[in-house]
Amino acid sequence: MGTLLISLAIGVFGSVSAQSGPVYELRTYKSTPGNLDNLQARFRNHTIRIFGNHGMEVIGFWVPTDEDGEDTLIYILKHESREAADASWRAFGQDPEWQRVAEESNRNGSILASVEREYMTATDYSPLK
């Protein structure tokens, strides 16, 4: 029984690490009250370009239309792999331009209240595949 569980675990984890193709990252940001415009301006004027400098491909940005989506920004990035995503985020966080932009945009208090993220791979029937 123990050997079977170990074999199943190796198979499951092995298949996760052996996935090929791009990885998509769904990110949901909640701005602090009244700061959605400032958050969007930071993306529009700086962040998207800096993402590109670190191999992060922007798929799109959305704002919810439901009332409870106020102060929310949702976007999807494409990465070559999960490892590439991790490396890109590390480089992005250490980028001097990004650090300056983040500091300037938060000088009157944080414009970001929370961040959620989910990594995804496209299904075999997805037009993205």
Labelled PLM ranges:
Residues 14-20:
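Boundary at the C-terminal end of the N-terminal hydrophobic targeting segment
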Residues 24-28, 74:
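Active-site-flanking beta-strand signature of metal-NTP-handling nucleotidyl enzymes
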